[in-house]
Amino acid sequence: MTRIGTPLSPSATRVLLCGSGELGKEVAIELQRLGCEVIAVDRYGNAPAMQVAHRSHVISMLDGAALRAVIEQEKPHYIVPEIEAIATATLVELEAEGYTVVPTARAAQLTMNREGIRRLAAEELGLPTSPYHFADTFEDYRRGVERVGYPCVVKPIMSSSGKGQSVLKGPDDLQAAWDYAQEGGRAGKGRVIVEGFIDFDYEITLLTVRHVDGTTFCAPIGHRQVKGDYHESWQPQAMSAQALAESERVARAVTEALGGRGLFGVELFVKGDQVWFSEVSPRPHDTGLVTLISQDLSEFALHARAILGLPIPVIRQLGPSASAVILVEGKSRQVAFANLGAALSEADTALRLFGKPEVDGQRRMGVALARDESIDAARAKATRAAQAVRVEL
């Protein structure tokens, strides 16, 4: 039986977010709608989720002692990681001491880097993946590329949003790809994965919810990546019944192995009826932002319900829908957005402006959402809305 108290009172149900970006912001809002007290933690101040949380803390998320100090101070009922780069060994310790980590500390630890989850999927679960090789040194990396063959992809074992990721078409790309991966890694100390290139038709995110009554799948989400970073997503992605069934089989296997309750973003490659496992996030997925307009319960609402042990009797997909990212390039601590009336002038459109405190280089600062009669029409409408937004640095 789920019981939720009153925020800021002795009966409060406290949820602590480890990471406070745009996905965490939506999770915080959904948890507050259900009466939770939300504490947001991240490495920089005024992060999006902090702007809607009851309280916030700024610490290095990779500093285990600092993370433990905040958690022991706040005594949350649920610890909810929103990013990969966290001191996961500390989460494992805290879970052993009786804290609840969503979905589990092991899931956070295995998915913190590409090696843990790839070895689980391919070697323990026997799921289909691309050929791969892990390397710590340039020489080992070169051997790995020779073994996997061209074209191939090299990525730091720890990075997000495509940082440090590149495609190698031949030996001339070896050094540049290695150097870029070394710059893009967050905390993997130079280790990389070399992956064989799968000639897929499309890639999907299958949002998979492990909740009190079992496992439920959202309709598949198609997406377009630029240099490994999401720019556009849509739901539903058209696919054969056989490919969908295989996608659900793979997603169920990997999420069952990770355990716990919550929403997972399972990334898959699809060619015809064949499916390969790519990656999994044990939390809402950026491509799933489309669910803010495509479903009656967004991925964030589903995550909140699953965390709190509430039922999810049905997930209604509302028709062809799309999201298009609002990217900002430049340097500013006072970004403003104009021409919003034009961006929202068409029916069935919406915007989310994330409220990130600064941009230095290129940063995802918002997303446009749209529904229409077909996926092509929804994508075009979302793109028009995103492009209509005028950014002032």
UniProtKB/Swiss-Prot annotation:
Q: Where is the ATP-grasp domain?
A: 119-308
Coiled-coil annotation reads: none
Entry annotated with the keyword Metal-binding: yes
The EC category is ligase
Sequence positions that bind N(1)-(5-phospho-beta-D-ribosyl)glycinamide = 22-23, 82, 286, 356, 363-364
Keyword tRNA-binding on entry: no
Q: Where does ATP bind?
A: 114, 155, 160-165, 195-198, 203
Q: What is its EC number?
A: 6.3.1.21
- Annotated Gene3D superfamilies: 3.40.50.20, ATP-grasp fold, A domain (3.30.1490.20), ATP-grasp fold, B domain (3.30.470.20)
Q: Would you say which domain of life the source belongs to?
A: Bacteria
GO terms under cellular component: cytosol
Q: Which reaction does it catalyse?
A: N(1)-(5-phospho-beta-D-ribosyl)glycinamide + formate + ATP = N(2)-formyl-N(1)-(5-phospho-beta-D-ribosyl)glycinamide + ADP + phosphate + H(+)
Extract the Pfam families matched here. ATP-grasp, PurT_C, RS_preATP-grasp-like
List, alphabetically, the InterPro entries matched.
ATP-grasp, ATP-grasp_carboxylate-amine, ATP_grasp_subdomain_1, PreATP-grasp_dom_sf, PurT, PurT/PurK_preATP-grasp, PurT_C
MF (Gene Ontology): ATP binding; magnesium ion binding; phosphoribosylglycinamide formyltransferase 2 activity; phosphoribosylglycinamide formyltransferase activity
Q: Its pathway?
A: Purine metabolism; IMP biosynthesis via de novo pathway; N(2)-formyl-N(1)-(5-phospho-D-ribosyl)glycinamide from N(1)-(5-phospho-D-ribosyl)glycinamide (formate route): step 1/1
Keywords tagged on the record: ATP-binding, Ligase, Magnesium, Metal-binding, Nucleotide-binding, Purine biosynthesis
Role noted for this protein? Involved in the de novo purine biosynthesis. Catalyzes the transfer of formate to 5-phospho-ribosyl-glycinamide (GAR), producing 5-phospho-ribosyl-N-formylglycinamide (FGAR). Formate is provided by PurU via hydrolysis of 10-formyl-tetrahydrofolate.
What family name appears in the similarity comment? Belongs to the PurK/PurT family.
Query: How does it associate, per the subunit comment?
Result: Homodimer.
Write down the NCBIfam families for this protein, in alphabetical order: PRK09288.1, purT
Q: What name appears for this protein in its UniProt entry?
A: Formate-dependent phosphoribosylglycinamide formyltransferase
What organism does the record attribute this protein to?
A: Pseudomonas aeruginosa (strain ATCC 15692 / DSM 22644 / CIP 104116 / JCM 14847 / LMG 12228 / 1C / PRS 101 / PAO1)
